[in-house]
Regions:
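Conserved, well-structured functional cores that handle cations and Mg-NTP chemistry
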Residues: 3-198
Length: 198
């Protein structure tokens, strides 16, 4: 669930940045206000900071987890997870945090990640979406589109509801089905639902 929420949020941010570039000329001609990539990035940073202020709400053990500032503080772990590109964890850590020898190990990151509830990413998605939602209407109506898509994630045989063992030489994988709601006028995701692939 956390992987999905992070993927949806990252997809939303990336898509918004691309769409902003492609429609900016049209929006300027129409006299509309347009959110630029810097504004979108600031909105995401602000949403993460707001979560950090109440990080105990998103901790597996409130009062114990995320109380000290460690090598992987809460406010860095969230954007780090959003920035994953599919490499090994060690490479992801080096890419995101640089070659600083004081950066924590992959084991330390895994421990830190386990202290953050999956609901943190769901909350971030909704808070971020609300912060960029200008409630624009088209002829008095809000135009929404809903579409579904499958997302293959790492194989986990312990989750039989989404596990596919693979056949004909194909690797095993787990499958999630994502239904996302998109505002066609504002070009933002406003909601999403994750379901097991079976």
């Amino acid at each position: 669930k956390a992987t999905f929420c992070a993927a949806i949020l990252l997809t939303a941010v990336s898509k918004m940045a691309l769409v902003v570039r492609s429609v900016s000329r049209h929006a300027k001609l129409q006299g509309g206000l347009l959110m630029n990539p810097k504004t979108v990035k600031k909105a995401l940073k602000d949403a993460i900071q707001a979560m950090t202020d109440y990080k105990w709400l998103f901790s597996a053990r409130p009062g114990k987890d995320n109380t000290r500032n460690r090598k992987f503080p809460f406010q860095k772990v969230i954007p780090f997870i959003l920035a994953f590109r599919g490499g090994t964890l060690n490479h992801e850590i080096m890419d995101f945090f640089g070659l600083d020898p004081s950066t924590g190990t992959s084991s330390a990151f895994i421990q830190r990640r386990s202290t953050i509830l999956p609901e943190a990413f769901e909350s971030l998605f909704h808070d971020f979406s609300r912060s960029v939602d200008e409630n624009k209407l088209y002829r008095g109506l809000r135009l929404l589109a809903v579409d579904g898509s499958d997302l293959q994630i790492a194989a986990n045989p312990d989750d039989p509801d989404s596990y596919y063992p693979g056949a004909n030489g194909q690797r095993a994988y787990n499958l999630l089905h994502i239904n996302a709601m998109y505002d066609l006028h504002q070009l933002i995701y406003v909601d999403a639902l994750v379901q097991k692939g079976r």
